[in-house]
Amino acid sequence: GNEIYRRCTALFPGRKSFTVYDPCCGGGYLLTVLGFCNHNIGRIMASDVSDRMVSVAAKNLALLTLQGLDGRERELTELIRQYGKSSHLEAVESLRRLRNRLVRNVESTVFTADCTQTLPLADAPDIIITDVPYGNLVSWESGEKDSLQAMYRQLAMAAHSGTVLAVIMDKRQRYKGDSWNRLERQVIGKRKFEIYRLAKTD
């Protein structure tokens, strides 16, 4: 994910700060890792069709703030007091390492949304990066006949003229529309990623 994100930022020469959005965020792991590894992320937006996953993502993305790290450390300290497990002690050490990586608080907005329908974004993101459902989940939960194409259409409507989109997917999946121009494609085993920029309209 990090390498893909950096390829996206390279398309914005001179840009110092980015708003990043994942419309299929799951537990928010991709965005949380990106937030710790890239100090040019100023704001994160994340959504998923599952309320349960949105709740997990909100908790993970909160670690990108000192307040969130403090809260998690308090939880772990209480678990250590109750159970004394070595795994909890290791988690506290990991948390302290994360604190050292955090240069500034990263604001995050996490919400439930079906990315094949109209997305309630207050602002257009600079970079959209997502690892889309695949396998038995290819029809997703929206009931859309072709959820992948519907997602691309909705993201085009939520984007600004310079927005860059990176999609990680099964290598058999492909984009069939004309709202996005593909800039890059790479296959890695059974998966691939493609990077796009919004097509210019006359």
Map each language-model feature to its residues.
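Class I S-adenosyl-L-methionine-dependent methyltransferase catalytic core
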Residues: 1-202
